[in-house]
Amino acid sequence: MKFDNIKSKFPIFKQKIKGKPLIYLDSANSSQKPKAVIDEISRFYETEYSNVGRSVHTLAVKATNKFEETRDIVKSYINAQYREEIIFTKGATEAINLVASTYGEKFIKEGDEILVTELEHHSNYVPWHYLRKKKGAVIKFASVNENGEIDIDEFKKQITEKTKMIAFTHISNVTGTIMPIKKVTDLAKTKNIPVLIDGTQGAPHSVLDVQDLGCDFYAISCHKMYGPNGLGILYAKKKWVDELPPYQGGGGMINEVKKDEITYADSPNKFEAGTMQTAEVVAFAKSMNFAHECPLGCKPRSATSLSQNIIASALVSPLSSNSSDFLNPLISIEYTPSSIPSVFT
């Protein structure tokens, strides 16, 4: 699929701004949506809409089946072992908060350490800060060098017998650093420390295999990978979904409610309280299909090639490393309206 053909899949690019074709370079913030995703949301509301997991009428059965089909597609897409390991959330932020809250409540005590890096987005720092305030945990920061890379030997030195969680980004949203996940997870396994990966930038630009990565948790932001807003995914190993307590209380996450006792459903229902984002979940299946078929979306070499072409134009300079360990280095651009790099047009 050529680039022009890919761009034609997005209705928003039919418009012009100030007489010029729309050029959008903010997908790391939020990606535009292909027509297939937009159409699927409309189709679902027009023909199949119902709440899921609550009723047995025809529309409810259809909606529930579509909802659960997407869970199976996600499982396959990231190569999870069990469908119970796929939990739908409101976003990657909620996915990380879910882990910090439930794991923290059960396993973190005063003085325990949580190891993050200096590259983390607020979404992978603030939830752990809450644990620091609530439980007396200690947050340790693994430093990075001037190119935004971590030194794995220095990283090892930060791990102690009190380390109870390692949480870090897959790909930095600032520098484009691709983190050495497998080196960290291999190290963590020897010490029985769970690892959470913030995959907000990693999921749209990687061929994901969570079993190969060896992480315990992986958070995904769907609106950054051609999907609808207000939807995220938490991958959590079955060991953890079986052990962790519910995150929120409400309909759909219980087996039985009595006046003096409540029994909870198994995962994933245990972590999906209340009315879910049904249309968004159903439409996200189309997003994954698009990402799978698109030769640019999930191949880091395409993004790396783009950044190298931009730098080669001599109109930009990298503010971080331009090595193969980086997806897209942070760059500064200097141009006049008549000298926009050809890679942008």
Task: For every predicted segment, state its role.
Residues 1-296, 305:
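Pyridoxal 5′-phosphate
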